[in-house]
Amino acid sequence: MVITLPSPQVGAYPCGYSSARLGTRTQSCARDLTRLRREVVTIACVSVIPLVFTSGWASGINAYAVVLLLGLFGATGVSDEVPAALQRTDVLIVAGVLFLCEAVADKIPYVDSVWDTAHTVIRPVAGAVVAALLAGESGSLPELAAGAIGGSTALMSHLVKAGTRMAVNTSPEPFSNIGLSIAEDLGVAGIVTFAVFNPVAAAVIAAVLLALGIVTVLFLASRIRRFLRRRAQRRAEKRPAPAGGLRPDG
């Protein structure tokens, strides 16, 4: 039995038709690849924003703790998203020493407010720098945009902390300062650690805490004004009296 195979029909699929079809498929694949790249960049951008926001919030409360924790997580291999600049030994040593200084100053009445005043610029700048480094490590978000997010968030949380401390300092007992300082340190450590493993959930918690802090400061506005008046009075009392013991007419 002989099986005869059909001979191919020459010219059934012209060369021009095949080339056009191939070109169309190539263009379609290129468009799909471009769209896929955009989606990947968008997903990466969205994934780094929560960590940027959380690190900014935490930096406004204790910037040295944020740098120290992230640096240790990167140096020990806990997280691959930590920039190499934060893992340097000299950075970790300086951050650790300053963290210990803040841990002491932050628990002493009135000294904590002086410390907060000195860090009105330092904390937002630290939040912006850490956020920019995180964005640069991921390569998905412009460093300038990340710095703006981290710096503004750090400034807001710093103002909440400073305002709350002013209100607490109207009370003569020191235990409120100590308890609040310990709660802040533990909160920063816990949320930054949580952000390394679940950045979205940590960002939600940080946003809720920031909103609650703003509401609390508004509620304590009268105490804050009282603290500012007392500080102004103490400064006026420390001024040297004019010659002859007479005060200038006001």
Residue ranges and their predicted role:
Residues 100-113, 161-169:
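C-terminal ends of transmembrane helices
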Residues 125-133, 143-164, 186:
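Mid-bilayer segments of alpha-helical transmembrane spans in multi-pass integral membrane proteins
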